[in-house]
Amino acid sequence: MKITLKRSVIGRPQHQVDTVKALGLKKIGDSREVQDSPAIRGMVNSVKHLLEVEA
């Protein structure tokens, strides 16, 4: 699945910043192809308000 960072992590709680970094995203507009696994889905779900997800 493809994830794209759509909103900034500035001013967000540290655990959300860490989750976005763990997903491999750094700047707004960064995209990444990730495996669709339960662990990744949980990470994406915890910061879904910052991301755009394409199946």
UniProtKB/Swiss-Prot annotation:
Pfam families: Ribosomal_L30 (PF00327). It comes from Deinococcus deserti (strain DSM 17065 / CIP 109153 / LMG 22923 / VCD115). PANTHER family: LARGE RIBOSOMAL SUBUNIT PROTEIN UL30M (PTHR15892:SF2), MITOCHONDRIAL RIBOSOMAL PROTEIN L30 (PTHR15892). Transmembrane segments: none annotated. GO terms for biological process: translation. CDD domains: Ribosomal_L30 (cd01658). InterPro entries: Ribo_uL30_ferredoxin-like_sf, Ribosomal_uL30_bac-type, Ribosomal_uL30_ferredoxin-like. Keywords: Ribonucleoprotein, Ribosomal protein. The keyword Lyase does not apply. The gene is rpmD. This is Large ribosomal subunit protein uL30. GO terms for molecular function: structural constituent of ribosome. Part of the 50S ribosomal subunit. GO terms for cellular component: cytosolic large ribosomal subunit.
